[in-house]
């Protein structure tokens, strides 16, 4: 499942903003940074941002030298993001997920369990 354009984080300025201003949460081999959306950093600001979430995944070559494995992890996490039910009262928010070395050895179920725990810890879900 491909992450729709309206949910993608793109551009160096956006990533730098999240690294500098984002609140950091960690669970196992996953690290999530959560920042309020800064629409001035987007190339084409959308007309309405109510409840808009944008998501990016960073997987360095230290996690796996093989791009095939990194891309599989990225697709798995994009799908988990799209299937996740987030709080309805969230302001426009940007999420940036970093995977640490060793994440490629986790089973898909363990990785998704860590993702679920991480977003609950960040207060992004109702449960």
From Swiss-Prot:
- Offer an example of a GO molecular function term for this protein: 3'-tRNA processing endoribonuclease activity
Q: Which Gene3D superfamilies match?
A: 3.30.230.10
Q: Name one GO cellular component term.
A: ribonuclease P complex
Q: Does the keyword tRNA processing apply?
A: yes
What interactions and quaternary structure are annotated?
Consists of a catalytic RNA component (M1 or rnpB) and a protein subunit.
Function field? RNaseP catalyzes the removal of the 5'-leader sequence from pre-tRNA to produce the mature 5'-terminus. It can also cleave other RNA substrates such as 4.5S RNA. The protein component plays an auxiliary but essential role in vivo by binding to the 5'-leader sequence and broadening the substrate specificity of the ribozyme.
Put simply, this protein is called Ribonuclease P protein component
């Amino acid at each position: 499942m491909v992450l729709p354009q309206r949910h993608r984080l793109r551009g160096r300025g956006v990533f730098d903003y999240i690294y500098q201003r984002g609140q950091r949460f960690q669970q196992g081999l996953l690290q999530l940074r959560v920042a309020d959306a800064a629409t001035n950093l987007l190339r084409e600001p959308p007309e309405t941002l109510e409840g808009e979430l944008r998501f990016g995944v960073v997987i360095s070559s230290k996690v796996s030298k093989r791009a095939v494995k990194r891309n599989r992890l990225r697709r798995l996490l994009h799908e988990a993001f799209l299937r996740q039910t987030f709080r309805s009262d969230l302001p426009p928010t940007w999420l940036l997920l970093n995977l640490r070395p060793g994440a490629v050895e986790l089973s898909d179920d363990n990785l998704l369990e860590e993702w679920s725990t991480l977003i609950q810890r960040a207060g992004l879900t109702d449960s």
